[in-house]
Amino acid sequence: MMDEGSVGDVSRIDEADVAHLQFKNSEQSFKPENIEVREVKEVQVQREAGSPDCSYGVIADFLDGKNGGDHVELIGNEPCSSRQNTNDEGDVVEELTVKTCEGSSMAIVGRPSSRARLEMNRSQFLHRFPLDGDLPGSSSMSKKVIDRGTVSILRNAGKMSLPETSNGQLAIIAVNGEANEHLTNVERNPVPVEALSHEGIKTKMLSQSGFSQFFVRKTLKGKGVTFRGPPNNRSKARNMDQQTVASSGSALVIANTSAKISSSIPLAAYDGLPCLPSNTSKPSSCANPSDTHRGCGGEGLSLREWLKSERQEVNKAECMYIFRQIVDHVDCSHSQGVVLCDLRPSSFKIFKENAVKYVVSGSQRESFDSNMNKETLSQLENPLVRRRLGDTSSLSIPAKKQKSSGPSSRQWPMFQRAGGVNIQTENNDGAIQEFHFRSSQPHCSTVACPFTSVSEQLEEKWYASPEELRGDMRSASSNIYSLGILLYELLSQFQCERAREAAMSDIRHRILPPKFLSENPKEAGFCLWLLHPESSCRPSTRDILQSEVVNGIPDLYAEGLSLSIEQEDTESELLQHFLFLSQEKRQKHAGNLMEEIASVEADIEEIVKRRCAIGPPSLEEASSSSPASSVPEMRLIRNINQLESAYFAARIDAHLPEARYRLRPDRDLLRNSDNTVAEVENSETWSSDDRVGAFFDGLCKYARYSKFETRGVLRTSELNNTSNVICSLGFDRDEDYFATAGVSKKIKIYEFNSLFNESVDIHYPAIEMPNRSKLSGVCWNNYIRNYLASSDYDGIVKLWDVTTGQAISHFIEHEKRAWSVDFSEACPTKLASGSDDCSVKLWNINERNCLGTIRNIANVCCVQFSPQSSHLLAFGSSDFRTYCYDLRNLRTPWCILSGHNKAVSYAKFLDNETLVTASTDNTLKLWDLKKTTHGGLSTNACSLTFGGHTNEKNFVGLSTSDGYIACGSETNEVYAYHRSLPMPITSYKFGSIDPISGKEIEEDNNLFVSSVCWRKRSNMVVSASSNGSIKVLQLV
């Protein structure tokens, strides 16, 4: 005897090996009075509340003999509870084989997969459950049992399960007149027809069986579900699906008739029969369920949701374009012989560019085949199939209700939950026809499932055709009717869902709103054509596509596609143009590189020749120069890019020597001077046209110095005081004294050599001259040694006698602060001053009144006389420009230098033809005055831009000497440049003075260098910080 442990011995089988029920009927005719039920114990199985009556009606008809043929009844669809572990997700298949033969006995054995085990189990079962004529020792009868057909019952969740009574006994109803004679040792109780009424079904239970451990231990409950095949046909059935549905318990009723059946019919229990799929070949992509386009171009939006969205107004062109796509899809499906089952908005999704895709599964489609013969259609006359194909399903819907209503029902997750049957029938002619049934998908019916939302039920009702509501099969004309409903809903706009429901109810009676008729007269008539009550009067999809309403719809998506293609073409052309330009640029660059390489090789040869002409250096010179040469080489490598730019710029100028003579005709202003010696020196310096030689000369001067060293420090008692900011520094004619002036309202004269005396703790000025307001600038007279000019914040220009410490003259014609004052080196009696009153005034030391005034459009920040010409004056302005005037013509500037991005704070002459300017845009610019133009901006006159220091808001000082340039920085540093190269030679960082210890520390505390001044007879520069500290720095 088998116990519960035998469950583990039950092997799994796949779909191909599905168990089947085979039997051969006896020669005895089937009559209701021949039905007897052998039982050991009797159980009354009550019908559940809400169970359908149709199941019992079918059974009653069957018992009354109204339907002949083979009958296999699956009683019950109720899910059963089990003591099995419900968390087990594995599939366990248990098979019970019932063997029967004529005039013999009925035996139940185990799995037929093993012949030896089959014999052993059979003998054990017959010994435990002896039947009539099958007593121990009747081997011949046992052999007949094996040789005859077998009845195999597949225990599979969702297909069939054999329930047990409350005491664990297996319930089997045997409807076989001949088999009853072989059942012995049991009580014979015939079952009347009334026993199968709506009140209950009586069953007889076998005695204790080891197989009971394989089945549900619960009293059988449920209804009979009958399949009636056509008479005199041979039938086969096989499993079709592997999908899962809820398991249900069933009692098996086997009825044999007088007709001989050569083959067996395997059985499976269903929650409800599905729609009949198509026998035709698989349709094209437009109807193929594999091409549902889910997530294509994004998840998309359901057309139903799109219709429910708050549309401000109906875009007819957009809606008609959507409608045409759906018609195209339906036409494609109809051309493949497929009728769309769910042709309604919820079955479509709308994507970008209003592209519409059909997204329902393939089981929700039906096919129509005009070539289906009448005999095949007669198979569908079976009541069960006919009900399934109609608009209601009395079997499937209550079955689902039972699943959701039963409080104690549980499923067996280890079993598969869906099934299918493929019925092959063979007529007397030998023709074989095949029907496929699937239960893997919900039935598509006009009566919605309990799990369907109310809106979905309403949508199904709205889009169902009149013939579908009457119970007829769905056809291609039904899809046309649904298209008419869809067209009306697309072109309509509803205030609320209640208004939508009312309008959709009216359209079924062909009632259109007046607003719809007035706005869409042509579409309204077209819509009524599609909604014709008679299906034969409705158009086909081909007629719809060829109609004036649909055929004239612009292909918006195609237009968008064409625009996209045009855009791609434009982008492609643009990319091609870019690549051509890049290629041309690279080729040009390659040509320039070849020219530059040739120039470098030519210059190398020239340098080698010059060195050979000079002669080899002596051993002492070579040994002395080698250790020091490493430092300049490192600096050159660090600045190689800037050096290359300057070198090739010099090469370009060397190849255009005639450009030097394309100069303005009044360039004599640059040399108009009474200082003949200076003019001769300058002519000797610039008489050569060797620009490359000039570059090499500048490179040597740049590499000559590498750093600043401190040579002297001016120590005063007023350090770290903001009132000590020094705005201007200047050496006298002999450079023995220098003057300082600033916010302290004092002009102080210091002896230069005294700064080198380190034994002095505090340096006092040689002379000190007070002023009424803050001082902005000072300038020594280059001819009269003791004359000093100053400018202050009151706009007063004063002439001081340094010997006496008194002011000689006051020039008070400026209306605002005077920023700068300068003496002319060529004419020592002339001086000029610039002011915030946007004017430059010319003075003479022998006269009180102004000699002349230059009016400017912006504030004047600095003034500077040319060192060679007594008539050339330059000044910087806050309008980012530098102006040069011929003092013989004050009405218009001689040239305007434009290139800075901020105010020009300083302007200094390097020589009579070169000017350097400083600006608060962090740059210095070198201007070649020979390249300027008259009456316009001279943007091409800038020959070099220096950068590296910081100057954004303060006056930091500017000074020049023999081609070297010094300036301050807002980082509290002093920078040194040479005119030939744009990068700094070196810089020096000022430190702040500790007020307690008096020592210098690294912190700058937002200090900046406020003024610098070269001592031209040496490579020294005096610089001042904004805290009043003054240092003498020397380039080494």
UniProtKB/Swiss-Prot annotation:
Gene: SPA2
SMART domains: WD40
KW Nucleotide-binding (keyword) present: yes
Protein name listed in UniProt: Protein SPA1-RELATED 2
GO CC terms, sorted: Cul4-RING E3 ubiquitin ligase complex; nucleus
Ranges: WD repeats: 721-760, 770-810, 813-855, 857-895, 899-937, 948-987, 1004-1036
Gene Ontology MF term list: ATP binding; protein kinase activity
UniProt motif DWD box: location: 915-930
Highest rank taxon of the organism: Eukaryota
TM spans (from-to): none
Subcellular location: Nucleus
Nucleotide-binding recorded as keyword: yes
Role, per record: Involved in suppression of photomorphogenesis in dark-grown seedlings. Probably part of the COP1/SPA E3 ubiquitin-protein ligase complex.
Residues forming coiled coils: 587-611
Upregulation: Not induced by red, far-red or blue light.
Positions of the Protein kinase domain: 200-550
Record's keyword terms, sorted: Coiled coil, Nucleotide-binding, Nucleus, Phytochrome signaling pathway, Repeat, Transferase, Ubl conjugation pathway, WD repeat
Subunit (UniProt): Interacts with CO and COP1.
The record's note on its domains: The protein kinase domain is predicted to be catalytically inactive. The DWD box is required for interaction with DDB1A.
BP terms from Gene Ontology: photomorphogenesis; red, far-red light phototransduction
